[in-house]
Amino acid sequence: MLVRFACCATLAGALLMPQGARAEGCAAQISKLMSKDTEKLTTRYNRITRQIQERGSSPRLVAEECRIARALTPRLQGQLTAIKESGCIKDPQMGNMIADIVRGHEDDLAMALKTTARSECR
C-alpha cells in the first residue's frame, strides 16, 4: 500500500511539474515581451483620446493623438506578433490571461490604425 501511494505521488508530481514550470516560463516570457514604454504610450493615447471626446478636438490634441498613434502602431504590432509566436496562449494555466492581453492589444492597434488613417494625421 505504501509503495503504491509513493508511486502515485511520484507520477502525480511528474505530471504536474512540467505544466507549472511551463506556466512560470510563459509568465517570464510574457513579462519580457510586455514593454513598459508601449504601455505608457497606450495610456497617453487613451488619455488624449478621452480629452478629445470630453473637450472637443483642438489642433494640438489631434496632432498629439496622431503622433502617439504613429509611434504606438509598430510597437503593438511587434508585441502581438511576439506574443502569438511564443505559444504561451496554448498553455492551460496562462492561456486565458494571454488571450485577454492579445485582445486588448488588438483593440488598441485597431484604434491606432484608425487614427493614423484619418486625413488629419497624414
Name the predicted role of every residue range.
Residues 6-14:
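Bacterial N-terminal signal peptides
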Residues 13-15, 58, 80, 113:
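Residues at the start of alpha-helices and the adjacent loop-to-helix junctions
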Residues 21-64, 117-122:
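Immediate post-signal-peptide N-terminus of mature secreted/exported proteins
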Residues 11-12, 29-31, 70, 92:
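Extracellular/secretory pathway and lumenal proteins
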Residues 1-5:
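Bacterial Sec-dependent N-terminal signal peptides
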Residues 67-122:
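Compact alpha-helical subdomains of small soluble proteins
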